[in-house]
Amino acid sequence: MFKAFATIGFVLASGAAMASSYEVCDQPFALCAASSSSSTGRTIVVNGISYPEMVAVCPVMHGPAVGDTAGGNMKGSCANPGSGQVWSLYQPRKNIPQAPNWDPKTPAPYRTFTTAAGAGLSNMFSFSCTLTKKVKNVQLANCYGPADETLAGTPVPVGTKVITQAPVGASYPVGGPLP
């Protein structure tokens, strides 16, 4: 687990991401670290750059989690984004409920992959999510964020090494580039 904390800490503290405002938010949140995503067919603008918008179905967890109050669409605060909504935040976990069975004991090991044309990543970190349904007592949320965008709000080039907890074969897994 220390290796996971160290890796995530290194990613969060690297490069341009250092200028962001990371805070611990203690509230319900969507944990998208082990989710895949699919295109909505729309675009989303981050720091003046248009990206393809992706949607990920993510389990809602409780407790302290890290958010970037200057990133995503958090607008400076951990305050709830609205009625029926939560933020997509990050909390290291060995097990994360995942589609299709949403079993809370599903292992979610860290893995890396290299992006390729048409096989990138999605960034849901610190974007708002809409609560949907419960499956096997796990509350789910639809989270919307950009494809191939870094934590610092810049494009991810093809050939970038990425870390994720999504299973091998996941479409546009939620993750972040390694420095």
Feature locations, PLM:
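Bacterial N-terminal signal peptides that target proteins for export
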Residues: 1-8
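Mitochondrial intermembrane space
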Residues: 20-179
